[in-house]
């Protein structure tokens, strides 16, 4: 089966355009057979990858869905299973770059044809292959296509296409070659992120979350492993399988099954299942403490009193001299301690047990921006001893 592109053209129908329209029809027929959920108009799902020019500064995710349906400018690429199997050498272990409960992620090289051009160039991508046995995996696959097919932001990973063939469900993303924030904080030993890099990564992640909240989407799974880094260490949020539309009208929350990752989920959500944007803010605060300490939110191999990050850091008050003891030793004292304290105070604000007392992500973006600007005015390489 050939690769298909879904799109509509407003230009006069030349012979080339007629051929493209035939591909469009074949693509819709293919989807109706393999994943009818994606062609049901009632769900207002769309598979266009928006461009800044086409994005009308929407007020909600529903506006994006409506805009894509009316525009009908659908251009997410539909891959055949054979094409992705060939691109990954039949999903070779040598090309596997990630694995989780959903399935596995592989590095692959695909042809990248330009519309209207018979030539193509190779493109390196990431292919996520879901476990065939997982019903939940299929739901999350739909959710990813659902959201990433319409959102467009520099700090949200770009979905290039998908495959839905028989029971196979795959997603194709831009490749984030520097792996995840989690990898650099806890796993990789070849490179330590500087304090400045950590702040800039968290600022980008905050901007991505602020955008999602602006269009009324709750991410629900913010954690260091979902912050991916490209070759320039530019951060992008990934894995939208748990994302949900936010509350409407006078509703203050949406009620969902309690899912997520231990240590990152807000306590009120764990108890009640009530989901708000405040839940994402809590998770963000947890990751702020991860970049400060170089510790995971849960360290089960540590002594019992040190296993839970948020409980452990309370023993080292921010304004005390002992606070320096929790800062990641891999930073080798190369950070302005006053700025680290400010980030810790922001983290405390984010993880406030009273959800309404937490800041908005827009406030977090502003705060981190100010901290970075002030940090840049200081010597980022000075030792903590000098800064006291």
From Swiss-Prot:
It comes from the Eukaryota. Its main location: membrane. GO terms for biological process: defense response. Residues 91-372 form the Protein kinase domain. Keywords: ATP-binding, Cell membrane, Kinase, Lipoprotein, Membrane, Nucleotide-binding, Palmitate, Plant defense, Serine/threonine-protein kinase, Transferase. May be involved in plant defense signaling. This is Probable serine/threonine-protein kinase PBL20. The gene is PBL20.
